[in-house]
Regions:
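Winged-helix/helix-turn-helix nucleic-acid-interaction surface
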Residues: 1-18, 49-124
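Short recognition helix of helix-turn-helix/winged-helix DNA-binding domains
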Residues: 1-43
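Alpha-helix N-cap/helix-initiation sites
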Residues: 24-27, 31, 47-48, 62, ...
């Protein structure tokens, strides 16, 4: 890891029982929008994004699509104000998972460095 902070994870664990229970009322299009937004947020390290960004992420070209995106944002994401009163969306569970994994891998990395250092001293 060479001093680099771990913050990019290529896989997102999907808790299928929770996901299915929380999305059973959505249309297939809305489920796709939700998954697309979750995946985008995960690849960006769970960083917040604007409503306009969400429309672009979901490739909206109609008011109907924008309405579906906003429905998903409003139901599953949290709107927060940031610098200059810019409002952005976050997903609480994604942020928690990202923080958990970052801490977990940082701890493993530190333990590995200690183990490697101990082995190198024993070899000499």
């Amino acid at each position: 890891m060479d001093g680099k902070e771990i913050n990019k994870f290529h896989a997102l664990q999907l808790f299928t029982d929770t996901f299915a229970a929380e999305t059973v009322h959505l249309t297939n299009e809305q489920v796709g929008i939700y998954i697309r937004l979750l995946c985008f947020a995960w690849t960006k390290n769970a960083k917040p994004f604007t409503t306009e960004s969400a429309y672009r992420i979901c490739q909206c070209q109609s008011k109907e699509c924008e309405g579906n995106v906003y429905k998903i944002l409003d139901e599953f994401f949290k709107l927060e104000s940031f610098l200059n009163n810019i409002e952005k969306w976050t997903h609480k569970r994604l942020v928690q998972e990202h923080e958990y994994l970052t801490a977990k891998y940082k701890k493993r990395s530190e333990a590995g460095k200690k183990g490697g250092l101990a082995r190198s001293k024993n070899v000499a």
